Structure formats: structure tokens, C-alpha cells
Amino acid sequence: MDAPKEIFLKNYTKPDYYFETVDLSFSLGEEKTIVSSKIKVSPRVKGSSAALVLDGHDLKLLSVKVEGKLLKEGDYQLDSRHLTLPSLPAEESFVLEIDTEIYPHKNTSLEGLYKSSGNFCTQCEAEGFRKITFYQDRPDIMAKYTCRVEGDKTLYPVLLSNGNLISQGDIEGGRHYALWEDPFKKPCYLFALVAGQLVSRDDTFTTRSGRQVSLKIWTPAEDLPKTAHAMYSLKAAMKWDEDVFGLEYDLDLFNIVAVPDFNMGAMENKSLNIFNSKLVLASPETATDADYAAILGVIGHEYFHNWTGNRVTCRDWFQLSLKEGLTVFRDQEFSSDMGSRTVKRIADVSKLRIYQFPQDAGPMAHPVRPHSYIKMDNFYTVTVYEKGAEVVRMYKTLLGTQGFRKGIDLYFERHDEQAVTCEDFFAAMRDANNADFANFLQWYSQAGTPVVKVVSSYNADARTFSLKFSQEIPPTPGQPTKEPTFIPVVVGLLDSSGKDITLSSVHHDGTVQTISGSSTILRVTKKEEEFVFSDIPERPVPSLFRGFSAPVRVETDLSNDDLFFLLAHDSDEFNRWEAGQVLARKLMLNLVSDFQQNKPLALNPKFVQGLGSVLSDSSLDKEFIAKAITLPGEGEIMDMMAVADPDAVHAVRKFVRKQLASELKEELLKIVENNRSTEAYVFDHSNMARRALKNTALAYLASLEDPAYMELALNEYKMATNLTDQFAALAALSQNPGKTRDDILADFYNKWQDDYLVVNKWFLLQSTSDIPGNVENVKKLLDHPAFDLRNPNKVYSLIGGFCGSPVNFHAKDGSGYKFLGDIVVQLDKLNPQVASRMVSAFSRWKRYDETRQGLAKAQLEMIMSANGLSENVFEIASKSLAA
């Protein structure tokens, strides 16, 4: 294997040759597939004598022609990664024809062209197209494509590719063909092909200009009934994008295909979106509310890419957040408008804190726009996506809805059908609004989560209230020193009755800004600065970073009393939730310290009262209450410790949950009883909120291990009319080891063994369990007939799930580490992308005590010494060891 090579943003150069048109032809076969490409090539500089270097991986080259002339072996250079054509016609353009042979049935990496459950399918982003044919596999090569697909008519009755269907027909030998043409220029990562035995759910959407678009969702016949929600979601997304951003669909056909073997969640290929089945298929009996919500969001996300990603794409892969950060922001807004904005915001911020903050503090920390990579697949991360979305959200916070829309409009006006950079998006936002963004671009170039400290003071004589901010970004690999960045802080001030004070003016840096309203945006751009509010009649309680206005960690001088006050009164619902979370984190950290010193644990009664009053506040959204009474996760608490202690944190969280359940059991029982329903399942916010609150209360009660509550949960399991309620009852019961748990897990499997998506949930529930010694159960499940190491969803459920139980993954004897190490080496031979996702669980090994460090390090070293290690796994393992 060649030594892994690091690619750097600073080394970007324009291509020497552009491709204008690409005509592809596929002859699909059982043993081999022949791919022919005919490309119109033009030099960037006329008369250029530069060599044309094409990427290619795992391809058998059959022939190369230039302007119809067959090249001999001495006319080109071929190695394991490239086809180089050194001497080319110097005229304005020429035609290049290449024939290759590939073997999709042997392709377990699931990138390029592969077989999934008997069907042909593609995944080309980021660099999978080079596994199909020799090509300049980079996103700034945008061309117009046609694609002719031919295959056996019985085995592959449906032949799909991008764009519009031009012609189709039968050919000899029981075969048939379809010819597709995409009128829009696109990079090769958006190419797609699907062939197989599929049926479609059909519908139409009439765009605002009156064009009728044919919509088709393709699945195997038995799954067709489960596509109704996906079609609803697609039509809702199309309407929303027109209403909110003025963006209309640009072709006459939109296809979605669901496949069971898929590395990612879904892929936005032009007019032929390919989805992981779990993000398309749903019925009340086989999918939970969380699945329905995920399908809505991801179908929105991939559809929104038609403009933010496809019509305007990335110049190079370092700019990935240009399309992904923006499109995640758009799907978050869409889901917020379809449900509860506050609850969606809480869910998104929780995800950021649980997954992205740790990444930003570990060996894989990288900016929203990375400076370098060995394997681009490793940078489809929570930093690029979720932190990237927060960066886009800050533009909207600063510019307002109308200003943000003006920026988006200018972005498309300037860059339609171009491959551009993060600076181009920044410039459109700035120029459309004549805005001063100071040092905002630092968000794209600096890794690490800023830590903002806030100190307040009140001057009763002058009736002024001051907020002093200081910001610091911790060092990250390759970035020891940081510059201050632009942090928008949305602030409100509460009076002693809990009402927002109307603000009149704020003094900052020698200027006075007049404001009117109950909240304002402070622009923090320096290492230290002060803002002084005037005409404040009494000492207020500040509500800071309303709506989580910047992706930062915040340290304030708010007392516990202030936090209880905000929990009870803040008009910003996000900050009500946040006050409860800050209190819970403080409380749990103190208890961890007590536990480590063998002191008895006791719960602050004020905390119980605070949550109790939220629980009984009928004016609050039920899903908000469910979120507000959910404790911070073990990972969040460990993140705040100098040396993470999984055993202590697990014991403390379990103690707090049981204490809350015990003290609030009457209220919790009432909630379960009052929020049951025997009516048919409806996916809407009020029903989802009702189920979320009921099931959160049920989980609390079942944690008490009281026979009466176990019976209650068992009854909920048996009486449930949908999977949301049934699975929540199953999860509540399986918290506690014993015969009841074993029996009910067996019952659930027997009921759903023929539905692979439900079985994956069954795997996940067992793998994430905190019951003692769970690694042995998970090892047994590897041999379960329903498990398959070649299927990414099953790996994410069983192995990824196990890594999500800190107490078992970080078991003191190293059994969790050894289990994962062995699996990663096996997986890497099959699917390097999935293997590198799994090895990431080791990345923060230095956060733990010396014994655990030694055990984890040994596994990383074992992985690094494996023969034929992929670049994907090498990059994560080597960076983790070097930390």
C-alpha cells in the first residue's frame, strides 16, 4: 500500500482541464460491469501541454481513445490510483473515451457502484466516482451528463439515473436499456445509478410557477406501504423551500430510492436521491416518533441540497460545510416550522454538546473548514455539519430573517452552477446587507469551542447594569494559539417579578446604542469587553445567549438562586431548559466528587422542587417538559472533569434519577395515566409531545425497580398501539437485569424478527445497556442470525451502540476496548468508512485514568500494526495516538 498522503487546503490549484459533457454507458452484469465514458475535454489555458491526471481505484482499464485514436500502453501511465495522459491535442477541446471493467458484487465498501440486496446502487460522495471510471474526481469539475444503463430485464426491470428519461427499450438477449439526460452541470459526486426490482409510490407536486413535477419513491414491493410519510415529507419540503427561500424545483421528475446497505444517512444526487432505508420507511407499528421526525428532517435536508449543494457546489472538499452547514441549518428550520421550534432547538443543541464539543476538544478537532485531511470520508463530521449549521445560524441572528434571505438571494444570483468557497457565502451575506462582520471568518478557520466568561454588576445609584465578557479558545492540534472571534450574544434582563425589562440603551466601546424591546444582540468581538445597560430600575437577572445564539461554552456568575429563577420565569424557553441543565450539571459534578470520596450522596431538595414545578406547569409544551426533566448525559458530565470517571458518573446519574423518581412518583404516575391513548397513531406535534412526556415519566418510574411500576411498564408494553409506546416500555423494562428483561426482549424479537429495521432497534437497546458486564451479551449478539458485519446499520446499532455506554465501553478490565479493537480490524477489511467511524470511539483515550489509558492505547497500537490498514482508519488511529 502507498503511504497515506495528507492533502492541504493551501495547496489547492485550479484544474488544467475542464470537462464540458460526459456520456456514460453501463452494461450491467452478474460477474462484471463494463463502463464506457465519452468526455469532451477543454484545457483551462488554450495550447496547454499539461498532462491530464485521472483518478481511478479498483478499476480494470480496457481501452483509452483520444479523438477516436486508440492509445497504446506507452501513450499513458497507469498506477494503482491514477491514469495519466502526458501528451494531448493542444486545440480548444478534444474527446476522450475510456472503457473500464468493474465488479460491483465484490464491492463491500459500499462506495462507487455496488450491489445491495440484489439491486445495483451507487454512492459517489466524496470520492467514490473513481471506483466507477477514470475521471478528475473533484467537485470543481462540473459537466453535463447523459447516462445509458442496460441490464437483464427480469433481474433489473427498473433502470434509473439522474435527470430526465429520454428513451428506453428492449434489446436482444432478454436485456433492456434506459437513456437519461441531466440538463444541469454537476460534479461527479452527484452522479447516481440504480437498477433492480423496485416499485414506486407516485405523486405529483405543482410548483409555484405551475410546473407539475412527478414524484416517485422506489422500494422493494413489500416496503411500499411504509413510504407514505416520506412522500408527505418530500411535498412539505418542496412547499417550504418555495415559501421561505423562494427556491423552486428545476426538473420534471424527482426520484428517491431506499436501500438497506448504505454507509451514510442519505445522498442528494441530482433528481435521484438514494436513502438508507431507515430514513424512508415508516409505519406506526415499525417506526417511532423519533424515526418519523428523522425522516421528515433528512428528506428535507436532501431535497434542500438541490439548491444548496447541487446548483451551487463546493470548489474543493475543504469547503464541505458550505453545502452541509447551510443545508443542516435549512433542515433544522424546516423541522422547527413543522413542529416545536423550542424543542427542536433543544434537541440540536444537545446533539452539539454531546458529540461536537468533545470532538472540538479532542485529537480530531478541526475547523468548520478543515486545513488538511488524509481521507475526506473522515471529515463528514459533527463539526462540519452541526457546528457549521450554528455558524450559518449566527448570520441569521445578526441579519434577521429578511437580511438573511437577501444574502441567500445574492448568493444564488452570483454563483448559480458554480463551485465556490465559504468566503463566497460570507461575501454574499455581507454585501447584500452592507454589514460589518469584523472577525467572523475566524469561525471557519479555528478549531475548538470558545469559552465565554460573563461577570455582571449593578450600580443602584446610576441605575446601570454591566456585563463584562471575556473569550478564550483552547489550543487544539496544530493550532496552539487562537484569535478572538465574533460572538453574537442575545440578552434579556428579568426584573424581580420574572418579567422582561424593556431595554432602552446600551453603552459599549465609547458609543451608545439605542434599543427598544426586551432583548438585544451584543456583538462580542474582542478578548475582553464590557456592555453597560442604562435605565435599569433594579438589579436584574440576565438571560444570556438566548436561543443558544453562539456555539460556545458559557461560564457566568449566576447563583443557583438566579438559575432556579430563570428555570421558573425566563420568557426564552430555551434558556428555561438551559437553567435546569446548568443546575443539574453543577449538582451532578458535586455528587461525583462526593462519590469519589466515599461520602453519602444526597439530592438538593430545591432541585427536586424546581423540576417538580416544571412537571406540573400545564402552560408548558409537553415535549418541552420531557426535555426539561431529562438529566444531562454521562458524557456531558465527564466532559467537565479533569480526569473522566465513567463509574462515578454512572453511579451518580443513576442515583439522581432514582431519587427524582422516588420523590416525584405521584406526579410521574399521574402523567403516565393522563397521557395514554388508544386512538390510531398520528404524527403531529401534540401527539408526539404527549407520548414523549408519558414515556419519559415511565422510564423514571421503572428505574425504581418497584414491582408495581414494572407491572405498569409491562402493561404499557402489551397495550401499546404503536412502536413509540411499545419500544419506550421495552426500554424502561430493560434497564434492570433479570428474567423480566430477558423474557420481554425475547418476546419483542419473536414479534419483529422479519423486519430488519425493528431488529436493529432491538440490537441497539441491548448494546447501549448499562447493565453490568454487557460486553459478553454484545459478543453473543455478533453471532445472532440477524446480525451481519457487512451491513452498516447493524454495525452502528450493535457496535456503535455499545461504545455509547460509557460504563461498559470503558470497563476497568479493558474488555470493552479489546472488543472494539478486534472488531475494527475485521471491519476495516470489509468497509473502511464504517471501521473509521467505530475507531473514533478511542479518540479521547487520554481523558481517562492511567490504567484505562494503557488499555486503550494498546488497542490503538494493535490496530495501527494491522496488515493493509485503510487510510480511513490510519488517519483516526494515528491522530488519536499522537494526541
UniProtKB/Swiss-Prot annotation:
<dbReference type="GO" id="GO:0008237">
    <property type="term" value="F:metallopeptidase activity"/>
</dbReference>
<feature type="binding site">
    <location>
        <position position="125"/>
    </location>
    <ligand>
        <name>substrate</name>
    </ligand>
</feature>
<dbReference type="InterPro" id="IPR014782">
    <property type="entry name" value="Peptidase_M1_dom"/>
</dbReference>
<protein>
    <recommendedName>
        <fullName>Puromycin-sensitive aminopeptidase</fullName>
        <ecNumber>3.4.11.14</ecNumber>
    </recommendedName>
</protein>
<feature type="active site" description="Proton acceptor">
    <location>
        <position position="302"/>
    </location>
</feature>
<feature type="binding site">
    <location>
        <begin position="265"/>
        <end position="269"/>
    </location>
    <ligand>
        <name>substrate</name>
    </ligand>
</feature>
<dbReference type="InterPro" id="IPR042097">
    <property type="entry name" value="Aminopeptidase_N-like_N_sf"/>
</dbReference>
<dbReference type="InterPro" id="IPR001930">
    <property type="entry name" value="Peptidase_M1"/>
</dbReference>
<feature type="binding site">
    <location>
        <position position="301"/>
    </location>
    <ligand>
        <name>Zn(2+)</name>
    </ligand>
</feature>
<feature type="site" description="Transition state stabilizer">
    <location>
        <position position="385"/>
    </location>
</feature>
<dbReference type="Pfam" id="PF17900">
    <property type="entry name" value="Peptidase_M1_N"/>
</dbReference>
<keyword id="KW-0862">Zinc</keyword>
<dbReference type="InterPro" id="IPR038438">
    <property type="entry name" value="PepN_Ig-like_sf"/>
</dbReference>
<keyword id="KW-0378">Hydrolase</keyword>
<dbReference type="GO" id="GO:0008270">
    <property type="term" value="F:zinc ion binding"/>
</dbReference>
<dbReference type="InterPro" id="IPR012779">
    <property type="entry name" value="Peptidase_M1_pepN"/>
</dbReference>
<dbReference type="Pfam" id="PF11940">
    <property type="entry name" value="DUF3458"/>
</dbReference>
<keyword id="KW-0031">Aminopeptidase</keyword>
<feature type="binding site">
    <location>
        <position position="305"/>
    </location>
    <ligand>
        <name>Zn(2+)</name>
    </ligand>
</feature>
<feature type="binding site">
    <location>
        <position position="324"/>
    </location>
    <ligand>
        <name>Zn(2+)</name>
    </ligand>
</feature>
<keyword id="KW-0479">Metal-binding</keyword>
<keyword id="KW-0645">Protease</keyword>
<dbReference type="GO" id="GO:0016285">
    <property type="term" value="F:alanyl aminopeptidase activity"/>
</dbReference>
<dbReference type="Pfam" id="PF01433">
    <property type="entry name" value="Peptidase_M1"/>
</dbReference>
<dbReference type="InterPro" id="IPR037144">
    <property type="entry name" value="Peptidase_M1_pepN_C_sf"/>
</dbReference>
<comment type="function">
    <text>Aminopeptidase with broad substrate specificity for several peptides. Involved in proteolytic events essential for cell growth and viability. Plays an essential role during prophase I of meiosis. Required for correct meiotic reconbination in both male and female gametophytes.</text>
</comment>
<dbReference type="InterPro" id="IPR024601">
    <property type="entry name" value="Peptidase_M1_pepN_C"/>
</dbReference>
<dbReference type="InterPro" id="IPR045357">
    <property type="entry name" value="Aminopeptidase_N-like_N"/>
</dbReference>
<dbReference type="InterPro" id="IPR027268">
    <property type="entry name" value="Peptidase_M4/M1_CTD_sf"/>
</dbReference>
<dbReference type="InterPro" id="IPR035414">
    <property type="entry name" value="Peptidase_M1_pepN_Ig-like"/>
</dbReference>
<keyword id="KW-0482">Metalloprotease</keyword>
<dbReference type="GO" id="GO:0006508">
    <property type="term" value="P:proteolysis"/>
</dbReference>
<dbReference type="Pfam" id="PF17432">
    <property type="entry name" value="DUF3458_C"/>
</dbReference>
<comment type="similarity">
    <text>Belongs to the peptidase M1 family.</text>
</comment>
